UniProtKB/Swiss-Prot annotation:
Its EC number is 1.18.1.2. Residues 98-142 are annotated as: Disordered. GO terms for molecular function: ferredoxin-NADP+ reductase activity. This is Ferredoxin--NADP reductase. It comes from Nostoc sp. (strain PCC 7120 / SAG 25.82 / UTEX 2576). The gene is petH.
Amino acid sequence: MSNQGAFDGAANVESGSRVFVYEVVGMRQNEETDQTNYPIRKSGSVFIRVPYNRMNQEMQRITRLGGKIVSIQTVSALQQLNGRTTIATVTDASSEIAKSEGNGKATPVKTDSGAKGFAKPPAEEQLKKKDNKGNTMTQAKAKHADVPVNLYRPNAPFIGKVISNEPLVKEGGIGIVQHIKFDLTGGNLKYIEGQSIGIIPPGVDKNGKPEKLRLYSIASTRHGDDVDDKTISLCVRQLEYKHPESGETVYGVCSTYLTHIEPGSEVKITGPVGKEMLLPDDPEANVIMLATGTGIAPMRTYLWRMFKDAERAANPEYQFKGFSWLVFGVPTTPNILYKEELEEIQQKYPDNFRLTYAISREQKNPQGGRMYIQDRVAEHADELWQLIKNEKTHTYICGLRGMEEGIDAALSAAAAKEGVTWSDYQKDLKKAGRWHVETY
């Protein structure tokens, strides 16, 4: 859907303001039509700087990728933000945006300062939230000053070595998903739970240029799978789809590279990046996790930090005492990634961890259709709503973007029973830093 009214207004600004900034929401990758167009997708708004002579073309591209333009401003109008917004400069659309693979992350884009990375939030701002009765309150958004970001950049990546590459999908499952562990010895690649790293695959793209990096959610805690501060792990699905014109099977460049990589191979790694999905420091926090497929990666890091014996021993300052609930959507039982780990935690900590599966090709929803994660959320919406109202509760959503609408609908129904408008309440949760989303 094009925003023609916004375009007409932008065209009549003062002479000399010939570069505009689009604020776009909902931008996504469409597997049927846009696999080769390098779309971007990250939670929240995307800000794209567009020359006047490319405005119409860029609008069409945004619409094709499922995006919605919510505002158009001149660059000078945004200078008041003082670096709080990440802006992608559009020259050739495909050259500035990297293809999303794996768990759907997008390459960081250039900011006005020329540095690559994610937008920096203000140090602290007073934000509205709701108490248990739905009343408006305020709280200061949490600071993340000590979070490591961009320790290694694309022009000088860290060279890691593959230690192991293990299959996660059991016999009879669908697709290829691998758990890949890298050796970080000799470097200074520090990270924390909820962040991502970039992988630069070898070779060149269709234009003969070096392949761009792809971002993947980290699947290990800050101490690594061996709890020795020497490794980092990823959970990667091989991207596979049918070309919309030829019908041929096409495989993702970076995901195929990673899922088939041999132990001992060297890999170019950048980052870490990201502050959207960080786990709260409060050991008494409640954590709701809604994940599909490889969206389990950050959830695994949270659960290991909370419950694994070696992790608890390594983190005496963080002994989780809250309540966590994972709702995990997969197509078949063999596709339940890290199944043994998850169920071991559930058995050992039944009062602190609840595990719920939505297995779409094996279970039915109340209407007789497939049981997707949004159906499970609807089934438990009243319980989830009561938990979300607790000011210590953080909610994390990672995986397929399609689940968001159903999740919102379910929670809207639950909130409406108490006279609360979910969309308004959700905005307050986001401002308070208690609603975290990474979908694709």
